[in-house]
Protein backbone atom coordinates (compact mmCIF):
# COMPACT_ATOMS: atom_id res chain seq x y z
CA UNK A 1 0.00 0.00 0.00
CA UNK A 2 2.97 2.36 -0.12
CA UNK A 3 1.75 3.93 -3.38
CA UNK A 4 -1.37 5.24 -1.66
CA UNK A 5 0.69 6.39 1.33
CA UNK A 6 3.05 8.32 -0.94
CA UNK A 7 0.17 9.90 -2.86
CA UNK A 8 -1.44 11.01 0.41
CA UNK A 9 1.81 12.58 1.59
CA UNK A 10 2.47 14.14 -1.81
CA UNK A 11 -0.82 16.05 -1.65
CA UNK A 12 0.27 17.59 1.64
CA UNK A 13 3.80 18.30 0.36
CA UNK A 14 2.63 20.07 -2.81
CA UNK A 15 -0.79 21.38 -1.74
CA UNK A 16 -3.94 20.03 -3.33
CA UNK A 17 -4.18 22.53 -6.19
CA UNK A 18 -0.63 21.97 -7.42
CA UNK A 19 -0.90 18.22 -6.87
CA UNK A 20 -4.01 17.81 -9.01
CA UNK A 21 -2.70 20.21 -11.67
CA UNK A 22 0.44 18.07 -11.81
CA UNK A 23 -1.57 14.87 -12.15
CA UNK A 24 -3.56 16.40 -15.02
CA UNK A 25 -0.36 17.48 -16.76
CA UNK A 26 1.07 14.00 -16.28
CA UNK A 27 -2.00 12.37 -17.83
CA UNK A 28 -2.11 14.86 -20.69
CA UNK A 29 1.56 14.39 -21.54
CA UNK A 30 1.99 10.69 -20.71
CA UNK A 31 -1.47 9.22 -21.06
CA UNK A 32 -1.89 6.04 -23.11
CA UNK A 33 1.86 5.45 -23.04
CA UNK A 34 4.61 4.08 -20.86
CA UNK A 35 6.00 6.15 -18.00
CA UNK A 36 8.10 5.62 -14.89
CA UNK A 37 8.50 7.28 -11.51
CA UNK A 38 11.31 9.52 -12.74
CA UNK A 39 9.11 10.90 -15.49
CA UNK A 40 6.26 11.41 -13.03
CA UNK A 41 8.66 13.33 -10.77
CA UNK A 42 9.77 15.53 -13.66
CA UNK A 43 6.19 16.23 -14.77
CA UNK A 44 5.27 17.35 -11.25
CA UNK A 45 8.38 19.53 -11.08
CA UNK A 46 7.62 21.14 -14.43
CA UNK A 47 3.94 21.80 -13.74
CA UNK A 48 4.31 23.04 -10.15
CA UNK A 49 7.67 24.82 -10.16
CA UNK A 50 8.63 22.78 -7.08
CA UNK A 51 11.77 20.69 -7.34
CA UNK A 52 10.44 17.24 -6.49
CA UNK A 53 13.85 15.51 -6.50
CA UNK A 54 14.26 15.29 -2.73
CA UNK A 55 10.69 14.15 -2.11
CA UNK A 56 10.98 11.30 -4.60
CA UNK A 57 14.42 10.34 -3.26
CA UNK A 58 12.96 10.19 0.25
CA UNK A 59 9.54 8.67 -0.33
CA UNK A 60 9.59 6.83 -3.67
CA UNK A 61 13.10 5.59 -4.35
CA UNK A 62 13.83 4.69 -0.72
CA UNK A 63 12.02 1.78 0.96
CA UNK A 64 10.26 2.23 4.28
CA UNK A 65 8.95 5.30 6.07
CA UNK A 66 10.20 8.14 8.28
CA UNK A 67 9.35 8.52 11.94
CA UNK A 68 9.32 11.94 13.61
CA UNK A 69 8.76 12.41 17.33
CA UNK A 70 9.12 15.04 20.04
CA UNK A 71 12.04 14.22 22.27
CA UNK A 72 11.69 16.99 24.84
CA UNK A 73 10.28 20.48 25.38
CA UNK A 74 11.64 23.46 27.31
CA UNK A 75 9.23 26.30 28.15
CA UNK A 76 10.34 29.84 29.00
CA UNK A 77 7.55 32.20 30.12
CA UNK A 78 7.42 35.82 29.09
CA UNK A 79 4.97 38.11 27.31
CA UNK A 80 4.34 34.96 25.31
CA UNK A 81 5.09 31.39 26.29
CA UNK A 82 8.25 30.38 24.46
CA UNK A 83 8.60 26.68 23.70
CA UNK A 84 11.83 25.11 22.53
CA UNK A 85 10.82 21.81 20.97
CA UNK A 86 13.44 19.14 20.37
CA UNK A 87 12.57 16.55 17.73
CA UNK A 88 14.01 13.14 16.93
CA UNK A 89 14.04 11.39 13.55
CA UNK A 90 14.05 7.61 13.13
CA UNK A 91 13.05 5.43 10.19
CA UNK A 92 11.20 2.22 9.46
CA UNK A 93 12.68 -0.18 6.92
CA UNK A 94 15.76 1.88 6.09
CA UNK A 95 18.57 3.98 7.55
CA UNK A 96 17.70 6.99 5.40
CA UNK A 97 17.67 10.59 6.67
CA UNK A 98 14.57 12.44 5.48
CA UNK A 99 13.99 16.13 4.76
CA UNK A 100 10.33 16.91 5.35
CA UNK A 101 8.05 19.78 6.25
CA UNK A 102 5.89 18.73 9.18
CA UNK A 103 3.30 20.40 11.37
CA UNK A 104 3.84 20.81 15.10
CA UNK A 105 0.64 21.46 17.05
CA UNK A 106 0.55 22.90 20.56
CA UNK A 107 -2.88 21.90 21.83
CA UNK A 108 -5.00 22.92 24.79
CA UNK A 109 -8.66 22.57 25.61
CA UNK A 110 -9.77 25.66 23.69
CA UNK A 111 -7.28 26.65 21.00
CA UNK A 112 -4.44 25.08 19.03
CA UNK A 113 -1.29 26.65 17.65
CA UNK A 114 0.03 24.86 14.56
CA UNK A 115 3.26 25.77 12.79
CA UNK A 116 5.11 24.13 9.91
CA UNK A 117 8.79 23.31 10.36
CA UNK A 118 11.39 21.39 8.37
CA UNK A 119 12.92 18.33 9.99
CA UNK A 120 16.15 17.44 8.20
CA UNK A 121 18.42 15.89 10.84
CA UNK A 122 18.38 13.14 13.42
CA UNK A 123 17.67 15.90 15.96
CA UNK A 124 16.31 19.41 15.49
CA UNK A 125 15.16 22.19 17.81
CA UNK A 126 12.40 24.69 17.03
CA UNK A 127 11.34 27.84 18.89
CA UNK A 128 7.60 28.48 18.94
CA UNK A 129 5.99 31.38 20.82
CA UNK A 130 2.31 31.29 21.73
CA UNK A 131 -0.02 33.04 24.20
CA UNK A 132 -1.60 29.67 24.99
CA UNK A 133 -0.61 27.12 27.60
CA UNK A 134 -0.76 23.82 25.69
CA UNK A 135 -1.60 20.58 27.43
CA UNK A 136 0.25 18.49 24.88
CA UNK A 137 2.39 18.96 21.78
CA UNK A 138 2.21 16.65 18.78
CA UNK A 139 3.74 16.19 15.33
CA UNK A 140 1.41 15.74 12.35
CA UNK A 141 -1.69 15.71 14.52
CA UNK A 142 -3.94 15.87 11.47
CA UNK A 143 -2.28 12.94 9.65
CA UNK A 144 -1.05 14.76 6.57
CA UNK A 145 1.92 12.37 6.31
CA UNK A 146 1.93 8.59 5.95
CA UNK A 147 4.81 8.16 8.38
CA UNK A 148 5.64 5.25 10.68
CA UNK A 149 2.92 6.18 13.18
CA UNK A 150 -0.73 5.18 13.28
CA UNK A 151 -2.87 7.13 15.70
CA UNK A 152 -6.37 7.84 16.89
CA UNK A 153 -7.77 10.76 18.84
CA UNK A 154 -11.11 10.67 20.61
CA UNK A 155 -13.19 13.04 22.72
CA UNK A 156 -14.47 11.11 25.72
CA UNK A 157 -18.04 12.02 26.67
CA UNK A 158 -19.12 9.02 28.74
CA UNK A 159 -17.69 6.18 30.77
CA UNK A 160 -17.31 2.75 29.20
CA UNK A 161 -15.34 1.00 26.48
CA UNK A 162 -13.72 2.79 23.56
CA UNK A 163 -11.78 1.25 20.69
CA UNK A 164 -8.88 3.31 19.36
CA UNK A 165 -8.63 2.10 15.73
CA UNK A 166 -5.23 1.46 14.12
CA UNK A 167 -3.46 1.55 17.49
CA UNK A 168 -4.09 -1.89 19.05
CA UNK A 169 -5.35 -0.09 22.16
CA UNK A 170 -8.74 -0.19 23.86
CA UNK A 171 -9.86 2.16 26.62
CA UNK A 172 -12.22 1.45 29.49
CA UNK A 173 -13.10 4.85 30.94
CA UNK A 174 -13.86 4.65 34.66
CA UNK A 175 -14.67 8.26 35.53
CA UNK A 176 -15.11 11.37 33.38
CA UNK A 177 -14.06 14.06 35.78
CA UNK A 178 -15.44 17.58 35.60
CA UNK A 179 -15.95 17.71 31.80
CA UNK A 180 -15.08 15.90 28.57
CA UNK A 181 -11.48 14.84 27.98
CA UNK A 182 -9.47 14.20 24.81
CA UNK A 183 -7.29 11.10 24.48
CA UNK A 184 -4.74 10.61 21.71
CA UNK A 185 -3.00 7.26 21.28
CA UNK A 186 -0.07 6.93 18.90
CA UNK A 187 1.29 3.55 17.82
CA UNK A 188 4.91 4.09 16.80
CA UNK A 189 6.23 1.50 14.34
CA UNK A 190 9.88 1.89 15.29
CA UNK A 191 11.90 0.61 18.22
CA UNK A 192 11.64 2.71 21.39
CA UNK A 193 14.68 4.31 22.95
CA UNK A 194 16.79 1.85 24.93
CA UNK A 195 17.37 2.00 28.67
CA UNK A 196 19.62 4.90 29.65
CA UNK A 197 21.49 2.67 32.07
CA UNK A 198 22.77 -0.70 30.92
CA UNK A 199 22.39 -3.79 33.03
CA UNK A 200 18.62 -3.67 33.49
CA UNK A 201 18.32 -7.22 32.18
CA UNK A 202 15.21 -6.20 30.27
CA UNK A 203 15.02 -6.38 26.48
CA UNK A 204 12.69 -3.85 24.88
CA UNK A 205 10.73 -4.38 21.69
CA UNK A 206 12.65 -3.94 18.46
CA UNK A 207 9.50 -3.11 16.51
CA UNK A 208 7.03 -0.73 18.14
CA UNK A 209 5.83 1.26 21.17
CA UNK A 210 2.90 3.45 22.19
CA UNK A 211 2.45 6.99 23.48
CA UNK A 212 -0.61 8.58 25.09
CA UNK A 213 -1.38 12.29 25.25
CA UNK A 214 -4.39 14.54 25.46
CA UNK A 215 -6.36 16.90 27.61
CA UNK A 216 -7.49 15.19 30.79
CA UNK A 217 -10.06 16.83 33.05
CA UNK A 218 -9.44 16.63 36.81
CA UNK A 219 -10.86 13.31 37.97
CA UNK A 220 -10.61 11.63 34.57
CA UNK A 221 -9.54 8.01 34.93
CA UNK A 222 -9.28 5.22 32.40
CA UNK A 223 -7.86 1.76 32.04
CA UNK A 224 -6.20 0.68 28.79
CA UNK A 225 -5.55 -2.61 27.05
CA UNK A 226 -2.43 -2.80 24.87
CA UNK A 227 -2.48 -5.73 22.46
CA UNK A 228 0.72 -7.51 21.49
CA UNK A 229 0.93 -10.26 18.87
CA UNK A 230 3.79 -12.70 18.48
CA UNK A 231 2.10 -14.82 15.83
CA UNK A 232 2.97 -15.28 12.17
CA UNK A 233 -0.57 -14.54 11.00
CA UNK A 234 -0.60 -12.58 7.76
CA UNK A 235 -3.63 -10.62 8.96
CA UNK A 236 -2.59 -9.45 12.43
CA UNK A 237 0.80 -10.99 13.18
CA UNK A 238 4.43 -10.24 12.44
CA UNK A 239 4.46 -7.52 15.11
CA UNK A 240 6.13 -9.11 18.11
CA UNK A 241 7.27 -12.36 16.51
CA UNK A 242 10.96 -11.37 16.73
CA UNK A 243 10.53 -10.25 20.32
CA UNK A 244 8.49 -13.14 21.71
CA UNK A 245 10.27 -16.37 20.85
CA UNK A 246 9.32 -18.41 23.88
CA UNK A 247 6.85 -18.22 26.73
CA UNK A 248 5.10 -14.95 27.50
CA UNK A 249 5.18 -15.13 31.30
CA UNK A 250 8.15 -12.75 31.57
CA UNK A 251 6.58 -9.90 29.59
CA UNK A 252 6.36 -6.56 31.39
CA UNK A 253 4.91 -3.16 30.51
CA UNK A 254 7.40 -0.29 30.63
CA UNK A 255 6.52 3.39 31.03
CA UNK A 256 8.24 6.76 31.19
CA UNK A 257 6.65 10.25 31.23
CA UNK A 258 9.01 11.49 28.51
CA UNK A 259 12.49 10.94 27.07
CA UNK A 260 14.20 12.56 30.06
CA UNK A 261 13.16 9.69 32.31
CA UNK A 262 14.28 6.08 32.56
CA UNK A 263 11.94 3.25 31.66
CA UNK A 264 10.19 1.73 34.67
CA UNK A 265 8.14 -1.45 35.03
CA UNK A 266 4.47 -0.71 35.61
CA UNK A 267 2.83 -2.47 38.52
CA UNK A 268 -0.85 -3.31 38.80
CA UNK A 269 -0.84 -4.62 35.22
CA UNK A 270 -2.67 -7.78 34.16
CA UNK A 271 -0.89 -9.90 31.53
CA UNK A 272 -3.27 -11.98 29.42
CA UNK A 273 -1.29 -14.58 27.48
CA UNK A 274 -2.57 -16.65 24.62
Residue ranges: model-predicted function:
Residues 1, 268-274:
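Short, intrinsically disordered, charge-balanced linker/junction segments flanking boundaries
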Residues 1-85:
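Amphipathic alpha-helical substructures
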Residues 57, 115-117, 211-215:
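Beta-strand-rich interaction surfaces with strong enrichment in secreted/lumenal proteins
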Residues 66-69, 73-138, 251:
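Beta-strand-rich binding/interaction modules
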Residues 95-98, 148-151, 236-238, 265-267:
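Short conserved micro-motifs at the rims of enzyme active sites and ligand-binding pockets
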Residues 109-117, 259-268:
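Surface-exposed loop/edge segments in extracytoplasmic proteins
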Residues 141-153:
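Short acidic/polar inter-strand loop motif in beta-rich domains
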Residues 157-266:
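Self-processing/autoproteolytic domain segments and adjacent N-terminal interaction modules in large
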